[in-house]
Amino acid sequence: GLDKYQEIDKYCKGKGIEWFASAWDIESLKFLRQYTCKYNKVASAMLTHIPLLETIAGEGKHTFISTGMSEYKHIDEAVSIFQEIDCPFTLMHSVSCYPSLDEECNISLIPVLKEKYQCRVGYSGHEKGVLPSVLAVAMGAQVIERHITLDRTMYGSDQSASLEKRGLELTVRDCRSVGSIMGSGAKVISEKEK
């Protein structure tokens, strides 16, 4: 309800956090406008809701577009809406299983999406662990989205696919290490090897 959103907004502003939420219909999008969020988010289930996509793109805010449960034709249409209006966006590779098994994550799709759409690509993970998110960064993901919870045993549709505090800390730590681990790709003899 409204009181929960006001609590989230107040807390995040106090901590300097840019929060935002997925609007699942135009009325929800109008509701979220009162919080002057910097970003918009299209949930995977809304990827084919053309009036909603057009309204979101019309706001001109950078939008994160999740692509779970979709075919290329759906992504093509969404991308064209945002490109025609010149609204900045990031495609979020996602598998809409809660939780996703590691073998369902298909992280190799990230560079494919990047090449096909010539845009920023991120990863919205719903797996139990942290490795797929780290591998997503190694494959070129520029944004990582994970659900978080205080307790994975709590009741809720996505609690088991969420990270607790320690899991979030590990994800951030390991994702930040990817660049130095990947290196430059140049074949050089390091000082330690000499």
Where do the model's predicted regions map?
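Catalytic cores and adjacent flexible loops of soluble metabolic enzymes
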Residues: 1-194
